[in-house]
Amino acid sequence: MEHYDWNEGWLFTPQFDPALVRPECALELEPVRIPHTVKVLPYNYCNENEYQRLCGYRREFFAPREWEGRTVLLTFGAVAHDATVFCNGRRLFHHGCGYTAFTVDLTSALRFGQKNVVAVRCDSREDLNIPPFGGQIDYLTFGGIYRAVSLDIKEPAYLRDVFIEAKAEGDFRIYTSTVGETVGCTLQAEIRSPSGSRAAYSGELALPITGTLNGVHPWSIEHPTLYTLTVQLIRPGTGGLPDRVLDEKTVRFGFRTVQFVAGGLYLNGQRVELRGLNRHQSFAYMGYAMPDSIQQLDAQILKKELGCNAVRTAHCPQSPAFLDACDELGLLVFTEMPGWQHIGDEVWKAQALQNCREMVCQCRNHPSVFLWGARVSGSADDEAFYKRTNEAIRRLDPTRPTAGARNFRKSQLLEDVYAYNDYSYRGRGAACEARSAVTPDTRKGYLISEFGGQQFPTKPFDDEAHRLVQALRFAAVLNDSIAQQGVAGSFGWCMADYNTHREFGSGDRVCYHGVLDMFRNPKLSAAVYASQKTARSPSDIVLEVSSAMALGDLPGGVPTACWVFTNAESVRLYRDNDFIAEFAPDRRGRFAALPHPPIEISDFVGSLLEKYEGMDPASAQMAAAILNEMRRDAMELSPLSKARMLSLRLGWNDVVRMYYKYIGVLGGPAPVYRFEAVWRGRAVRTVVREPVQSIRLECTVHNPILTDGPTWDLSLIHISEPTRRTPI
């Protein structure tokens, strides 16, 4: 058994030529490294036609004579979208899905002891009769060999697949499939715990290996405990010869039990409130072609920075490296068959069914995967077709429920969970539809598979009022999905901005739907998610202020609303070192169902009128209310406030003078506002809003050590305003 990473030494042509597959090739080719995209696109104003092409890859290699009599397998992690593989001019394999892995047996075409050539005909055109193509698509699909490639040398008989069903109580079943002559062979399985303890089990090929491991630590969101299963295919020795290990396969897994009922999702018997985001697997410039480190970083951002406990892989199975990271972090994954809205003819459907099978077989050992998407996202009902997708998935994995994202009510429910794209919120009233009005079967599970960004696109450089509205919309739906009984949770649309086709987006080929931009920089709405995390130390405290407090940047110089997104116990506000007020979350207000409701800053005056105007406490409080109302309502006053002015013997000029002295900036220096997050009685984080005196930026390097390993590597560098923490 030998394994080789095969991501170097490839040659690329943007225009496929049949000469590419021949042993000798005089074509002018470009050296490339895998992962590779067929066309690097600009960040915006790109043209989707540029990556739609029939292109080719070629790699020469030497096949030593030691490989003769063995099986040589070449595995592609993903090729977008239609791939035909040749070896020494022979067509060996065709694969019609750009989102799943496939393996090609090169053995019969190899010339041992000689140079050999593998070539790939890669078709990334969008007129292919395979998912997701056939209709309009609200995302770009890119092209190329964009996931890793590997070569394995095995015996003629080998393990093709290993699958373990492992319940939270410790019961397990191990299923295997083999290739080649295996008569008389046996199986040996070993389960290794995180502590290093091992348990061995023997079995026959015809039956699953079953058993119970005592004292297991179940995989959960808080404690994502991973075990390792190693299965060996053994040919017993004869004539006094020892047993021979023909093949060995190792997978990671977790003991856990998933159940969806009318009351929600239960993981290991404990109810979980899903708080997730949808993730496209694309990035700026390179499309799908990113190394494992960046795929893993997305999972870390979702779990550690945004505080999510779940992610939906829109709208396809995604990188194994991403799923590995989700396993390690405790991030639940709702993955789905490739496609968007369109259902094609019978040829298209046959490929879609194959995609479902490949998705399940390639992802089912990941404990983070808790839900299969058995429908094309947003598509119409198709009873015959969706009966087949559900049957195919359940046959390969009876342990997980199925779902399918819909964009209409009372859809035929063949799955275990009704997943609904709820874009009903328009900024007022209920933020999500009543579950009973949407699902045809309230006895089954229900979740919101999309909401938010699509209905209120927000650019990172939009004005603060626009950015605040998006953030509060996300908060409203999160709140109402928690408050409504029977809703298992929600997946906001979406994690990050993404490139799209001309029919969608903001006219520049970008959908600005994310809580992050395309480079994973946070928008204000990211703080809605991040602030829902439970703080265990001061470093976990989030403090994000919606307003820059720069009146000169606002229409008419009229202040906008100011909200703070935080998981602290309270927030203290200071103006030029004068304490204004301390604000706590409103546990009975609009966002009361959230673990950490956003806090509206409603008082910018506090006791300043006592200190500087000589007012008694009662008069100062009444006058402060008038000034805060003027700030909130663009200098307009209610009849009640006008009556209070009379009782305080204040004229309009008096009120205007105090307004500009304590809230506005006319005639005086711009104030400095300081917001402090209070946690366990102490200020642990600070945000200061003041006119810029000097530019000071903080550089954060994600993945700072680049590793030229199985593939090329990349760092993500964020430049931002420094974070201030208050010494404790």
Task: Give the predicted meaning of each segment.
Residues 1-42, 121, 194, 471-478, ...:
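Accessory carbohydrate-binding/adhesion or oligomerization-edge regions at the termini
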Residues 3-16, 37, 47-48, 52-159, ...:
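Accessory beta-strand-rich segments of carbohydrate-active enzymes
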Residues 38-63, 67-75, 80-87, 93-96, ...:
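Active-site-adjacent substrate/metal-binding segments within catalytic domains
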Residues 87, 171-203, 560-582, 673-677:
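Beta-strand-rich binding/interaction modules
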Residues 111-115, 180-259:
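Extended acidic/polar, glycine-enriched regions
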Residues 173-175, 300-304, 310-527, 532, ...:
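Substrate-binding/catalytic cleft of secreted carbohydrate-active enzymes
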Residues 531-561, 567, 572, 687-715:
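Short S/T/G/P-enriched beta-strand
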Residues 718, 722-728:
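Single conserved hydrophobic/aromatic residue that forms the stacking wall/gate
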